[in-house]
Structure formats: structure tokens, C-alpha cells
């Protein structure tokens, strides 16, 4: 079941609008969010999207590619826990990782710079060393 992102059939005042076509279009459909969470094993889902392209969704994450700005070196490190999410505090409460989430890793606290539900990988920048 998809999510409908097409034009609404209600006016701001609450009245009904008339449809300008009889059927809904496929390009008006969306998808549900991935809600990437922590787990022991990573799991990715590959989907075909509009135009025949491929989107890799990261469903469960265990590791992140963390860049240390001082040394300018990237390392693959284990994620220990989700600290906070500026986008929505409920996401942090459920342990969901999105862009901008602060995560605790083996190196220290890092901020996620990639979109795990769109890219299929977690990239982060170290902001606080242990």
C-alpha cells in the first residue's frame, strides 16, 4: 500500500474541489519512511524507484563511517546508541537514525550527515572525542 501525495480534494475553507481527471496517477504515490534503527546485523532493502533507478534503504544499522575532522581520516566504527535527534525528539526516543542525529560511537559522539533511508549507509562527522 502506498502513500498518496496527490492534490487534495478539499479547499482550505472546507468545501469540496472537483477533480480535473478521473483517475489517480502513479507518480502521485509515495512510500512509508524507512525508520532506520540499531541492530547487531545490518539489513538493506533495494527498491526500484521512478525512472528505473535504484534506492538502497538501510533498515537496520550496526556501523557508521565516521570522519575525524582533525586527522581527516574516515573509519568504520560500531554505533553504541542514539543520543538525540534535532528533527524530532520522538525519533530519538524510539532509537531511529536520520540525518542530523547525534550518535555515540566507539570514537566518541558524531553527527549523521547522510540519509540512511535514502543512501543505504550511515556517514557521520566526529564532534566529541572520547
UniProtKB/Swiss-Prot annotation:
Biological processes annotated in GO: translation
Report the domain of life of the source organism: Archaea
Read off the InterPro entries from this record: Ribosomal_eS8, Ribosomal_protein_eS8_arc, Ribosomal_Se8/biogenesis_NSA2
Give the UniProt keywords, A-Z. Answer: Ribonucleoprotein, Ribosomal protein
Q: CDD domains per the record?
A: Ribosomal_S8e
Q: Which GO terms describe its cellular component?
A: ribonucleoprotein complex; ribosome
Q: Pfam families annotated for this entry?
A: Ribosomal_S8e
Per its record, what are the GO molecular function terms? structural constituent of ribosome
Q: Identify its protein family.
A: Belongs to the eukaryotic ribosomal protein eS8 family.
User: Assembly state and interactors?
Assistant: Part of the 30S ribosomal subunit.
Quote the protein name from its UniProt record: Small ribosomal subunit protein eS8
Amino acid at each position: 500500500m502506498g502513500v498518496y501525495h496527490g492534490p487534495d480534494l478539499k479547499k482550505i475553507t472546507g468545501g469540496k474541489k472537483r477533480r480535473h481527471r478521473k483517475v489517480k496517477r502513479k507518480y502521485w504515490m509515495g512510500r512509508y519512511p524507512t525508520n532506520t534503527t540499531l541492530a547487531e546485523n545490518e539489513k538493506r532493502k533495494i527498491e526500484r524507484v521512478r525512472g528505473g533507478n535504484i534506492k538502497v534503504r538501510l533498515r537496520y544499522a550496526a556501523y557508521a563511517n565516521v570522519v575525524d575532522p582533525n586527522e581527516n581520516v574516515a573509519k568504520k566504527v560500531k554505533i553504541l546508541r542514539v543520543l538525540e535527534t534535532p528533527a524530532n525528539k520522538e525519533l530519538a526516543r524510539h532509537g531511529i537514525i536520520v540525518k542530523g542525529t547525534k550518535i555515540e560511537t566507539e570514537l566518541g559522539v558524531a553527527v549523521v550527515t547522510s540519509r540512511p533511508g535514502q543512501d543505504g549507509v550511515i556517514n557521520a562527522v566526529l564532534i566529541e572525542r572520547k
